[in-house]
A protein has these predicted regions:
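Conserved beta-strand-loop-alpha-helix junction that forms the acyl-donor binding cleft
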Residues: 106-117, 133-135
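Conserved beta-hairpin
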Residues: 53-65
Length: 140
């Protein structure tokens, strides 16, 4: 485990960082957003406490991403692009498992995000379902 890796609970001072992180996400990794929310919408979302746990990922005192746990034990993880690497991803997930021990975790990964799919498998996750979405604008 990396000694300089920290998972810090989010607070109000992190809102701007989280918005910047969201704005830099690759479109292929979006599962929960069709379009970028406004900053005000983003703050409302954070303040609605949508997750049971939400942490800033920090290495060497630099914020590089976030990781959260939904109320259904689903893990979400996002890094700034320059910090996406498999060893770092694995270290963050392992640290998260130590911080939030549970019997069972889920991870939603876009089927287009092959890097995260491979990493999830390396960490012992296995495919349990395919989820499909119907876009209301495409009715028959």
């Amino acid at each position: 485990m990396t000694d300089n890796l920290k998972l810090l609970p989010i607070n109000e001072k992190d809102y701007e960082f989280l918005y910047k992180l969201l704005s830099e996400r690759k479109q292929i990794t979006f599962i929960s957003h069709k379009k970028m929310p406004t900053y005000e919408e983003h703050v409302k979302f954070i303040e609605s406490e949508p997750y049971s746990k939400w942490y800033i990922i920090q290495i060497d005192a630099k914020k590089i991403g976030s990781i959260y746990l939904t109320k259904e034990n689903e893990i979400g993880i996002h890094f700034f692009t320059q910090y996406e690497e498999s060893e770092r991803f694995q270290n963050v997930i392992k640290e998260f498992f130590l911080k939030e021990p549970q019997d069972r975790f889920f991870m939603n990964v876009s089927p287009k995000n092959e890097q995260y799919i491979d990493l999830a498998k390396k960490l012992g996750f296995h495919l349990v379902q395919h989820t499909y979405e119907r876009d209301e604008s495409k009715i028959f």
